[in-house]
């Protein structure tokens, strides 16, 4: 009888501990939690290769970026991300790149990233702004970080967009409010 009661107490304590560290509502989910759950869900989904797929979450908005081999994989990844508790919305920036093209694209994306980073360092307004290049996928540059002014944010987008090979600039940059 003592072992049975001890098992019940242990189970109740475990559930209480889980409830204490788990937010009550999806809106309370930390971004890191949403990102982790999305990554796990994608890794365990048939038809979605995660080797070239990245997930970021800012204020509940999940951003998928990277490359996938088919349009079906792109759609499936978005569907999975939308089903994650705490994901308020999903930005699907995934690029469809056939496996045969991936190596060439990755090399050119690396060169584009280097060029954008060099352009940022050469621009007095952007170089110490806190804005960075998170990734480049098939010519789509994803910017991230925090900055103090909208003007600096816009300057970074313009600088990145002016680099040869950039097809589009996406941004997750946060502009910190001034007091």
Regions found by a protein language model. Give the residues of each.
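N-terminal targeting leaders
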Residues: 1-179
């Amino acid at each position: 009888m003592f072992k049975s009661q001890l098992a019940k107490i242990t189970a109740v304590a475990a559930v209480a501990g889980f409830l204490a560290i788990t937010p009550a509502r999806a809106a309370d989910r930390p971004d890191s939690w949403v990102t982790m759950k999305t990554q796990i869900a994608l890794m365990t989904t048939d038809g979605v290769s995660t080797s070239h797929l990245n997930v970021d979450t800012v204020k509940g908005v999940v951003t998928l970026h990277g490359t996938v081999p088919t349009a079906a994989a792109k759609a499936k990844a978005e569907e999975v991300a939308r089903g994650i508790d705490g994901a308020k919305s999903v930005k699907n920036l995934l690029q469809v790149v056939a496996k045969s093209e991936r190596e060439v694209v990755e090399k050119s994306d690396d060169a584009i990233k280097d060029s954008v980073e060099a352009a940022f360092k050469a621009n007095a307004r952007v170089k110490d702004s806190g804005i960075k290049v998170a990734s480049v996928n098939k010519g789509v540059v994803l910017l991230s970080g925090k900055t103090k002014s909208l003007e600096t944010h816009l300057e970074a987008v313009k600088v990145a967009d002016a680099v040869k090979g950039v097809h589009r600039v996406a941004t997750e940059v946060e502009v910190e409010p001034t007091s």
